[in-house]
Amino acid sequence: MLDVLTGFAIIFVVIGVGFVLAHRGVIGKGEARLQFNRTAFWAATPALIFSSVATSDTSAFASPVVAVIAAASVATMLLYWLCSRLLFPRSGAETMAGAAAASYYNSVNIGLPIATYVIGDATYVIPALVLQMAVLSPFIIAGLNAQGTSLRSIWSSVVSGVTAPVVLAAVVGFIVSAAQWEVPDVVMKPLEILGGASIPMILMSFGASLKGDGLLEEDR
C-alpha cells in the first residue's frame, strides 16, 4: 500500500512542479509548453518504450489485460455508434468523433506514469498505447476525413499513425526481446537516460496546462 501511495505522490508532485513553473512564468503558454510534449513524443518516450520492451518478457503483449483493453475500446466505440444511429442521429464525422471521445483513454500522460510508478512496470501499458496509435487512431482519422477528403489523404493519416515514433520503438523493442538480442550498453545506457526524461516532461507539461486563464477573470 505504501508503494502505491508513493507512486501516486511522485506523479502529483511532478505535476505540481509543472503547475508552479507555469504560474511563475518559467514554462510559457501554448507553443512554449507544447515543446515538452513534442520532445517527449519524438525522443524521450520512444527511448523509454524501446528500453522497456527490449528488456521485458514478450509474453506481456499476449496478456489478458491487453485483450480486455482492446475489447473494451472496440465495444465502447460500437456502443456509441449504435446509440448515435438509433437515439441521436449524427453525421458520419460527428459519430466518429463521439465514438473516439467515448473510447479513447490517456495512455501517455496518465497511463505511462501510473504503470511506471504505481504498478512498477510500464510493459503492460505499451500494448495499449500501440493499439491506440497504430490501430484506433488511423481508423478514427480515416472516419473523420472520410467525407470530402481524398483517399490519398486518408492513407497518409493511416501511415502517420502506424509510423509514429512510439509505435516503431515498441515494434523494434519487441523484435529485440523476442530474438533475445542483447543491446550493447553504449546504445542502451543513453536510451535509458533519455527515456528517464519522458515521464517528468509529460507530467510537468500536464501540470503547466492546468495553469490557464480562468473563466471568471474580469478581463474576459
Predicted regions and their residues:
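Alpha-helical transmembrane segments of multi-pass small-molecule/ion transporters
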Residues: 1-220
